[in-house]
Amino acid sequence: MLGLDACELGEQLLELLRLALCARVLLADKDGESTPSDEVLDEIVPEYQAPGKKSMLAIWQLDPGDVSLVKYKQALLGPLPPIMDPSLPNVQVTRLTLLTEQAPGPIIMDLTGDLDALKNQVFVLKEGIEYKVKITFKVNKEIVSGLKCLHHTYRRGLRVDKAIFMVGSYGPRAQEYEFVTSVEEAPRGALARGLYVVRSLFTDDDRLNHLSWEWHLHVCQDWKD
């Protein structure tokens, strides 16, 4: 970085700090660590002003002649994803799958088509079984922080359960991501059997509604009921 004046050097250091924060965001959920907010950073670094969010393209185009910085960005962010259709949303949720070895067949919810049609479908779950939820999604353009999936479950008009799955933070890439929850147990007993309405939401730390949909779950005594 020879030849930079003090202001330019300061901008470079701030951008490197920005990249380091991106790394913390991408790895926080794996390590179980929390990511420092801009407010905390302001206290750690006196007179620090948090930079505005930069696009992935802008980050990649920063100092293309600095070999060490280019290598650092490649290790941190991975390859620059191919140019996507600008009409595509940044986050696309494609499927929700219930994983259980006890089911007679796959239980897959396609989220790329007519979401209203899901209201007319009933997904059957045998009482008392153990299962996991797999969420399949894509990130197309920019880093997204704090993805989470919420499920509000209703029976006879009353909310009986609220589940929040912390999915994490991800950068754009051509391949889909998959997130699998920990093991859940379906309710059991005569009082638990019946039809449930589930309202699901896929959102993030910025509270953007990436996808919301409603579906029906029938807890039965047996798969054939």
Curated annotation (Swiss-Prot):
Entry comment describing in which tissues the protein is expressed: Detected only in brain, lung, kidney and testis.
GO BP field: blastocyst hatching; regulation of protein localization; Rho protein signal transduction
Record's keyword terms, sorted: Cytoplasm, GTPase activation
Keyword match Amino-acid biosynthesis: no
Coiled coil (UniProt feature): none
UniProt-annotated location(s): Cytoplasm
Stated name of the protein: Rho GDP-dissociation inhibitor 3
Organism expressing this protein natively: Mus musculus (Mouse)
